[in-house]
């Protein structure tokens, strides 16, 4: 009996680095579940990062949502069955997207929280853009799921944001920035955190379980694996 065809994954991309890591994770890990050279059908659409950031910097989340919905419409027409976005920051607009979306979404924070719970973590350090660290997307969902959380101090939040937008999204990865993130995460381990959320989809390209003072929750790869599992259901 032929195996049912996997669901078609639609990726609403934002930055090239995060989207590429998500796509590669799905394609790299699918063969272990599906067989050699196999992966679900995947379509991706992205407006340029600059278009998104014009709205983000103005706190115009409806504008961000409109871009995401435009991508969603294109992916629905391409045959996608559900959607993901490997970008934590633009998830702040998802509440405006979901009610008008032609397709269902996997939420990156829901998937991170599920993995954190399965590993028995209780208090999570949140790293990412300033918007992610200072906003409510992770904070509300983590509290609702029963977690405590902590974020870096104001100076560290500003520096991490600079690293992300001046370096990581442009494919620049330096030892200086890696060392800085290690120091920040190390300080948060002393605040009782038992794992760190890599809450920017480019941070896993700089920090991983080997280099991090705390166990990592790699939001990019977690979302990719959740999408792969959903496609195979």
Model segments located where?
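Non-catalytic structural scaffold of enzyme domains
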Residues: 1-233
